[in-house]
Amino acid sequence: MSMSPKHTTPFSVSDILSPLEESYKKVGMEGGGLGAPLAAYRQGQAAPPAAAMQQHAVGHHGAVTAAYHMTAAGVPQLSHSAVGGYCNGNLGNMSELPPYQDTMRNSASGPGWYGANPDPRFPAISRFMGPASGMNMSGMGGLGSLGDVSKNMAPLPSAPRRKRRVLFSQAQVYELERRFKQQKYLSAPEREHLASMIHLTPTQVKIWFQNHRYKMKRQAKDKAAQQQLQQDSGGGGGGGGAGCPQQQQAQQQSPRRVAVPVLVKDGKPCQAGAPAPGAGSLQGHAQQQAQQQAQAAQAAAAAISVGSGGPGLGAHPGHQPGSAGQSPDLAHHAASPAALQGQVSSLSHLNSSGSDYGTMSCSTLLYGRTW
């Protein structure tokens, strides 16, 4: 390690004390008077009071000057007892070390490790904060007695265990339930009397009645909630099934369809006796029946004229083939012209033209008879 001002030593305890230890070793080897302090330092024991007060000046001695130029570097003068106590963990003698700032002030004229001019930004701080920083390690031995104290401490009382649940017999439960049905609340004398009867304590009877009352209330509440739920679900399901009666009632209330005669059609007044537009097919069928009946009436009139005989038989020879080709039904109609006239008149209400045609057939019948 070079001690030139260009290279600086790391600022740590081990880096500062290691060159001091080597320098003191060299001094002890050259000077026989320093054997006792170095032996105390090696063995880790406290130095005697006489050696503790002795100081070795770092002056123009050859061995000390050869060791890192410590005078020029401005390293503080340390006693062997202080260094030995610091390295062995005994901090009681740390107050004997000289202040670091005083040494730096005295050696400000020579070139040192940290420069000639100290930085004015940092305050003047002592090396080890004076004698108040001494630590008394002798009291640490009392920590070993904590184990004995913990052993001597009595264990903490555990929480009281819960009493085991008492199970009632069937006879006791039956008697309690029977009395509960009669009376839900018992007075103190009644409770004591019941407890003596079933061999229980009044407290047990009281607690059983309290629990049973709560149980009954909870069951009643659950039952009411279940019934309400069933009603809600039943009302929702029954709403779809009740649609049929509602539809039937609506149909009953709706007006019936009634056939109304048409008085005006396409801006033209219709006949008073004209049927409704929907009866066109019925009217056509009635007209066909009327035509058939008219033909039958003519044939019947011809048959009557033929059956009556007389001079008309030769005058009308054309009627004989027609009368001979008629069916037996026509002969039946010819035999009973009154029935034929009644049938024709019964269909006269279907159509005015049919009724007029019926009157014409009646006139032809009368005319045929006269003729």
Swiss-Prot record:
GO biological process, one term: cell differentiation
Family annotation (Gene3D superfamilies): Homeodomain-like
UniProt feature, compositional bias: Gly residues: 233-243
Region of interest (Disordered), ranges: 219-294, 308-342
Subcellular location: Nucleus
Family: Belongs to the NK-2 homeobox family.
Entry function: Transcription factor that binds and activates the promoter of thyroid specific genes such as thyroglobulin, thyroperoxidase, and thyrotropin receptor. Crucial in the maintenance of the thyroid differentiation phenotype. May play a role in lung development and surfactant homeostasis.
Name of the protein in question: Thyroid transcription factor 1
The gene coding this protein: TITF1
